[in-house]
Structure formats: C-alpha cells, structure tokens
Amino acid sequence: MLKYALIPLLPFAGFLIAGLFGKYLKEKAAYFPIAGVVGAFILSVSAFFDVVNGVKLNENFYSWISIGTFSVNVGFQIDQLTAVMLLVVTTLSSLIHIYSVGYMHGDKGYPRFFAYLALFTFFMLVLVMANNFLLMFVGWEGVGLCSYLLIGFWYEKKSASDAGIKAFVVNRVGDFGFVLAVLLIFLTFGTLDFSEVFASAPTSVGMRHERKGYRPELAV
C-alpha cells in the first residue's frame, strides 16, 4: 500500500523542497522534483504490472469528512484505467521536468518553476488516483491552480499575467459544472465513493425508467 501512496507523495516532496529551500539550492533545486517525478514513474510502472497480474486497490487512508452516516475518505483506487493514466502522467511529467532543466537554465525563477511543475504533477496524480468524487475535485482544483501559476509564471510581463487570469476565470466555469455534477451524484446515490456509485447506478437508472413506464428488457 505504501508503494502506491508514494506515487503522488514523491512529487509533493519535490515541491516542498524546491519551494522552501529553492533560494538556497539555486539550480540544484530541480534535482528534487525530477527525482520525485521519476520515482513516481518507476512506481507507476510497478503498479501497472501489478494490475496486469490481477491486483486491484481501493484503500482509504483516513476519514476526511464524517457527518452522521455520511463520510468522505482520503483514499486511492488503482484499476486498469488508473494504471494506464499513471503511466501517461508520470511519463510526460518526467520528460517535461528533464527538458525544463535546459529550457529554464539561467532564469531567476528556476526553483519556483520546478516547484510549480512538481505540484502540478502531484495534483494530477491525486485526480487520477482518487477513489471518490470529492477528492477528485480537489485534484481538479489543484491542477487548475497550478495551470494559473505556470501560465502566469513570468508575471512581470502583462501578456503572461493576463493569460494566467484568463485561464483562471475559464477554469472556474468548468468548476461550476463539476460542483453541480458532484452535488447531483450525492443527492441521487447518497455517497461520493466511486465503487458505491457505480454499484448503485444500474439499479437507480432502472428504477427511474420503470417509474416513467420504460421497460429496458422490452425495448428490443
């Protein structure tokens, strides 16, 4: 279980080191985000082969929100789709990190750039690995925040600053639809966990159809 939890945590550790100690490490600050993302890639490859061999994971770490019978946990799920997306995210992120070493060389914001990049990877992995809709929304919001920070990285330039603000505003439109969808799912199924929603979905849809006089088995 620890192996899977380290997939998002390694890039987050790289973000913390580059973000907190970047001004002391200078360009060496890039080593830590790169190591974290490459480490996440190696663990993602291992997770992929675990899934190929029949291993599936749906584990909760702790209860995030608990009100009466309703609870939302911080947990990760790894299935076939997740395993593939982990490979995609960590492969692309590793290549971008390595390429950026030369691309950003000499820039005064070098450590800050790699901190943002590692944080972006962390939130993307949270989005991919989340086992409930609320945690996935947190990952989505984090990706949106990091997109704003990266697009407006050279904030001294008006064009970059304006582009960052524009991206932030556009993402908020998507957030509104996301929040409505999550609320509708909760009102319909009484839970936000993927496994419980997907297990209840066929029954719920069938009941709605029958109430409207539609019989799926007769629609041939």
Briefly describe each language-model feature range.
Residues 1-220:
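...captures the hydrophobic TM-helix bundle architecture rather than a specific catalytic motif
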